[in-house]
């Protein structure tokens, strides 16, 4: 990850590539590079850091003359952000250069195979196996080499390929990662999204999974995975540049909400091999562990609260969830029998780093769950699992939260099997439920087209209460946070059973109460709380399954969620609450992507 561009035509390629990469900056990245064809060689330049540094290094592209080239911005997934790990990558013989957006799931076995055949690896990336496979399979027929290489890859990839034997040609390949061709006059472009294209052309061809394209300045031929020609229509791009960056969505937050099914799938898929869970290179030693402490801030903390139930239920180990800003000052009862789980999207959250260091100084082993490769927390940890959520631009997290939660679910099942605290029958049921989360998330989006209308009803509220029990309460915490941080409406969450211990005094005529009722085992109890607040004039917006007819009859309004195992329900329940907060904020004219007084990464105490 995170974006690729390519050009072949009459212009100098490097300035076009640099400009295209700048248009992809919004996606987030930690390094960048370009490769330009120069007669019988490929010139490559890459840097760690900003595209401005790459432009400076190449004198805005002037130092890399040539009319055919490829470019890349990287968000590290395999290997730290370094010049060596940055793309493009070159083959040992210098004949090929490749840029890649995605994740190659079987790269370790391919890497070992290629090393055994004498190929030398310069980087730690999964991408480098691609360029060596191309070299291995190339026998003078570039199309065949591309097809044979693609057939060996498992995972997601959008590729741009240069070969010195055909200096005006680029091959572009798509599998589960977006790739769009831009059609000009005597020139052709490609990019991960239209943002990088609209300054040059409005004519686009969208590749589908399993397709690849052979590109020259005057010629575009698209093939299916068997090498058979495919006819594709040219689509006229009507978006402006800003809209293109947002994928046609009005806000980044909405885009990221809608991306969650695919983001969670990207988190899950590489970690599930058949019916086994493989947590990257994190062979977590649970010997002697008698307590698990989860520490984080903000939404990451609430992800820990939601996952606590699954970990305790399956692993039979007590789990404490602690705010990092409190844990660091609390003289915690932590020692070598404690596993510390540290959650942070950025991996740079100041309070979380400080709490982590304090616990490690007392003997705890630390498992980090972060999104940014090479971040401080990932380096401090004994083990690290990356969420692979991709860049999240909106300040209010959505897919960052759900991918953290997904990794915690993976850990719960992984640890339970390792500790032998789960029988094979339940393990099978929960594995099926885990794999179903992306589909259920999409269903939760599809089931609630009327959330915008609900927002029109509730957006003038001065305060909102969110209630639930067990995992529903954990979701209520995050739902209330989403509402307050982007709509600026005072929103608080309460354990439903605690209402009568004080909070019910605040209920008045017309007071909005969002009641989560997604756990059948405790739905009756939550329903009694709904009756209590309704008796005092509250307007109840219930979150429940369509099959729960009694709640339908009690609530003033409904948000529906599909049925899923209650241990994993939080990842599905939260999605419509994110949408509710989004639409309420939109009704109130708030700056949704950049709420006032908030920052994406809190790197100070």
Region spans (language model):
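Generic C-terminus detector
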Residues: 539, 552-554, 564-605
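Glycine-rich oxoanion-binding loops at beta->alpha junctions
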Residues: 67, 71-84, 270-283, 307-343, ...
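Active-site phosphate/pyrophosphate-binding segments
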Residues: 260-264, 268-293, 383-512, 585-605
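Acidic/histidine-rich
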Residues: 156-187, 454, 459-485, 520-522, ...
